[in-house]
């Protein structure tokens, strides 16, 4: 059989060896595995992480984890963030307004306000990769320090049961819908941004059997098989080449952030890694 799912449930139940998370760099002699504190999709400005700015006793604002930054390359069980690739439309004849979603909580987006105050964006689109598609629609993806990625909220997903996965899935949906609602309706968001986002809505003719919302959570990573050969960065950069190719990959080495933590009193994302490579045979 072939297990072509994101999760690899059949693979696991069949007793195939696998791993979850990030190997330590020492396992395969790599450089870009494990903990990575890079500049991509990062908070480049100092952002206070505490509910009451400057007061660590007030607790952390939503979306920031308790873990302490480990040395670069340290392995763990964290996985890169999931999100939804969002389809919206600005065609008024095909648009359903973005309404307040289930479980909406504006405190989840405090980081947006603090980032905007520290480094004002000139457009709401600066918070996303906002790719226009045919028929006045979009393919929206994560961008920057805070966006559609729900960083650190998916670690249980790969080996969770179906009920727990459904909870994680729903939390991602609520967060993402809430982000768009927040940007369009919270009066603390600059008026020009609210005006921009309110031009958009869910397309009437997409995902009609799922309330016009995509059926698929972007499960970027889950279980990974440990076979006779394990593909590592050495294959991706061309230092190792296989002679029994079964497939081709044509994208960069890419990991989204895995955690959001406090480093020296500031909010930082951890785990992003983007290494440009040439298309090459990947086993």
Would you name each region that the model predicts?
Residues 4-278:
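Flavin (FAD/FMN)-binding glycine-rich loop and adjacent Rossmann-like elements that form
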Residues 279-283:
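A short, hydrophobic C-terminal helix/tail in secreted or cell-surface proteins
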């Amino acid at each position: 059989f072939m297990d072509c799912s994101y999760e690899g449930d059949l693979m696991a139940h069949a007793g195939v060896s696998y791993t979850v998370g990030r190997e330590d760099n020492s396992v395969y002699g790599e450089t870009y595995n494990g903990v990575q504190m890079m500049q991509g999709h990062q908070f480049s400005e100092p952002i206070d992480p505490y509910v009451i700015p400057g007061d660590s006793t007030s607790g952390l604002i939503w979306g920031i984890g308790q873990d302490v930054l480990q040395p670069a390359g340290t392995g763990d069980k964290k996985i890169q963030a999931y999100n939804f690739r969002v389809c919206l439309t600005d065609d008024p004849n095909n648009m359903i307004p973005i309404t307040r979603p289930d479980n909406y909580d504006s405190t989840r987006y405090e980081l947006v306000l603090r980032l905007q105050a520290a480094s004002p964006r000139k457009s709401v689109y600066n918070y996303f990769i906002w790719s226009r598609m045919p028929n006045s629609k979009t393919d929206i993806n994560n961008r920057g320090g805070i966006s559609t990625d729900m960083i650190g909220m998916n670690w249980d997903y790969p080996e969770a049961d179906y009920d727990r996965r459904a909870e994680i899935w729903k939390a991602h949906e609520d967060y993402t819908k809430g982000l768009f609602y927040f940007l369009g309706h919270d009066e603390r968001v600059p008026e020009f941004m609210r005006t921009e986002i309110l031009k958009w809505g869910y397309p009437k003719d997409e995902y009609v059997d799922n309330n016009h919302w995509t059926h698929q959570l972007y499960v970027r990573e889950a279980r990974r098989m440990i076979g006779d050969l394990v593909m590592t960065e050495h294959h991706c950069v061309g230092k190792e080449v296989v002679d029994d190719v079964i497939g081709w990959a044509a994208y960069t080495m890419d990991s989204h952030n895995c955690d959001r933590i406090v480093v020296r009193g500031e909010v930082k994302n951890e785990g992003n890694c983007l290494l440009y490579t040439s298309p090459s045979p990947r086993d």
